[in-house]
């Protein structure tokens, strides 16, 4: 876990120590209380008179205060968990998080006025992902799958045909929680592919829902992925579908990057994430154009696995040390991240690598124009702020949202620094033809970095550059300023 010292935890603001066990590695232990830093070791210090109970009282007060403000609040009415209003909020959040990675020839949004047959292919179109167990699995009252979401939205406007395409993990169970789904299918890969190609040939649109899932060595706890490629023969299915239908849309359901060797053959690619209860409804809204996509990637999709720091430096999979107390959890692998602070887009910038899709990337169904960038001062002191202003205009034909990103580049530093770092962003909604001013303000914290020798945050006078961008590689405007 993240706690490693009892006294540090006591005197530096930690109120509640979380964790299933004690070290994040073992599958369970009978003496867990003895090993939590804020459990028996804390009690022992108090009993021995080495510390008082002032901090303990503060921690208990903080926890109780939160409980009374939330679960024990008198304003919290019966039935307020998982209400329709919660569903509406969940759907809106899901819609705004969906990322349009690629859209050649404006295949998206789907034109329901002209489409007669829409084919949906892929196990992830029907597989439940939000079934309990923690993290993004959660425990939800319901989950709308992509296929159901599309069928409900399209209704009688077009025929929706489904084919499995591939079989991944037919079991409907995650972390001991059962979905009730039975996805068993005894057909061979060739039989599944043949069916998919047959129904896809004459379709107006083909939507492939693939990616990863929550099973072992996928997007799960404890076990790393075994491959960067999509599993379960998906790459072959996508490649063959692209040969028979020019309007192929791939929706990747995953929590992290995957290899896309077919990227040049597929016109439209959507990053669909794990979107919760309203996943299917949100994806349908974006695919048919009810909502213009406005999500941005929170990490880099590398062009190849060797473009990731740990792999480029030969550190992964590292030294295989079995640190687990229980063999049920398998071997634990220690990897030393010698790329240091140069992770994600910072590594790509440093090594001058071209990613498949960069950090901060995300397309829209409309277009945005970036105007002149202005700054309220050319130099600042450590006690001042500096504000950048830019005009953004929707030059397209539909409403949309753009995420304006502010990166800062430190031109000279006593320690190695990234080429640039994201220090602010703002999302702006614009009607067709509308324009708005977007302002982003930073202070000295945005110019600071951690000095691991002095063991403190420092800010050094010098020259900086503010970069306004639509992604880590889509630079729009720059302006220089100084810290005195």
For each predicted feature, which ranges?
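Hydrophobic helix-and-loop "lid/oligomerization" segment in the mid-to-C-terminal part
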Residues: 80-83, 163-245, 250-265
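Intrinsically disordered, low-complexity Pro/Gly/Ser/Thr-rich segments with frequent PxxP/GP/PP motifs
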Residues: 414-452
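Secreted, periplasmic, or luminal enzymes acting at the cell surface/secretory milieu
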Residues: 34-36, 43-134, 138-147, 151-156, ...
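Second-shell residues forming the walls of enzyme active-site clefts
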Residues: 1-33, 44-55
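Conserved acidic residues
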Residues: 15, 116, 204-206, 267
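Short acidic, flexible loop segments centered on an aromatic residue
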Residues: 397-414, 420-422
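Short, surface-exposed ligand- or partner-binding patches at beta-edge/loop junctions that are enriched
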Residues: 441-470
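Acidic, His- and aromatic-enriched active-site or binding-groove loops in soluble protein domains
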Residues: 10-24, 185-188, 268-280
